[in-house]
């Protein structure tokens, strides 16, 4: 999946990420850009507009929770399927999340990382990061296969 150099680059970058800020923005973007994903979060209150979503305290808190899990995955890049096995089971068997939504969440995480880290999030780093988020998305969708 990743070379040793790529692992070092993405884990070094990830160490600088403020998961609360980037997580809030990433989940908010997911819910705004892909509005059908809001069906899983109706209990979060007002999701009626982009502004409402991006300022929703429950969205922000859950975004942090999502990226905390992602951070755990960054520590286990060689065993993403094992690391995300329980979350895969939850999202497949109980929540019935469309596996494509994981890819959409990965795109929102990359956009939020670029928005928060600007020129540091180079195209090369983005390509390396994309390998990780694709691996996480595949691990989360593993239960569907």
Curated annotation (Swiss-Prot):
The keyword Membrane does not apply. The modification Phosphothreonine is found at residue 11. It comes from the Eukaryota. Heme b binds at residues 62, 91. GO terms for biological process: hydrogen peroxide catabolic process. Keywords: Acetylation, Heme, Iron, Metal-binding, Oxygen transport, Phosphoprotein, S-nitrosylation, Transport. Signal peptide: none annotated. Residues 1-145 form the Globin domain. One of its GO terms (cellular component) is hemoglobin complex. Red blood cells. Gene3D superfamilies: Globins. The keyword Ion transport does not apply. Pfam families: Globin. GO terms for molecular function: haptoglobin binding; heme binding; hemoglobin alpha binding; metal ion binding; organic acid binding; oxygen binding; oxygen carrier activity; peroxidase activity. InterPro entries: Globin, Globin-like_sf, Globin/Proto, Hemoglobin_b, Hemoglobin_oxygen_transport. PANTHER family: HEMOGLOBIN FAMILY MEMBER, HEMOGLOBIN SUBUNIT BETA. This beta chain is termed the B allele, even though it more closely resembles the sheep A allele. Involved in oxygen transport from the lung to the various peripheral tissues. This is Hemoglobin subunit beta. It comes from Ovis aries musimon (Mouflon).
């Amino acid at each position: 999946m990743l070379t040793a150099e790529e692992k070092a680059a993405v884990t070094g970058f990830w160490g600088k990420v403020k998961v609360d800020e980037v997580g809030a923005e990433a989940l908010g973007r997911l819910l705004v850009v892909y509005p059908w994903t809001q069906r899983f979060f109706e209990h979060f209150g007002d999701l009626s507009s982009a502004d409402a979503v991006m300022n929703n305290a429950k969205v922000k808190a859950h975004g942090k929770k999502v990226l905390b899990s992602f951070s755990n995955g960054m520590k286990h890049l060689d065993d993403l399927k094992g690391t995300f096995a329980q979350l895969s089971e939850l999202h497949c068997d109980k929540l019935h999340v469309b596996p494509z939504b994981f890819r959409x969440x990965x795109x929102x995480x990359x956009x939020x990382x670029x928005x928060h880290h600007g020129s540091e999030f180079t195209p090369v780093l983005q390509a390396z990061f994309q390998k990780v988020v694709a691996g996480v998305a595949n691990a989360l969708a593993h239960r569907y296969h």
